[in-house]
């Protein structure tokens, strides 16, 4: 995939709207903010389709989990792959190698730093919004031109 991918995922209770700008996006946040709900909605849609009550727009969006993650990932192309924080394989060198060698975008839900992956500080988000409507908000704001953050001096 190349470029931005705008995604909307909704059901009767929740609506998530966000844009992925690069191949790796990290979603962080406190408990109860809706990260796992988002993941579960996507997984339900993958398993049940329309019967899940979930609507997805923005391309092929899938969840990746379990022992067979490598085989499942090898089958995917030009997809948005969503991984929940319980998936230990995201810390492996094998996963990092697979990410480098494919054309998918990844949305990884984690509170941990993933040192083996190259991702931008600008692509770390949290979920903001109350009630039904939620969107991603950039976690790290920086002003490289200010004296306080000018690391080149």
Feature map (PLM): residue ranges:
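Hydrophobic anchor at the beta1->P-loop junction of P-loop NTPases
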Residues: 27
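Conserved glycine(s) of the Walker
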Residues: 33-35
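Post-Walker A alpha-helix
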Residues: 38-40
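Post-Walker A helix-loop "phosphate-sensing" segment adjacent to the P-loop in P-loop NTPases
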Residues: 44-55
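Conserved P-loop NTPase "ATPase switch" module shared by AAA+ and STAND
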Residues: 69-93
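Sensor-1/coupling segment of RecA-like P-loop NTPase cores
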Residues: 99-128
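RecA-like P-loop NTPase motor core
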Residues: 122-153
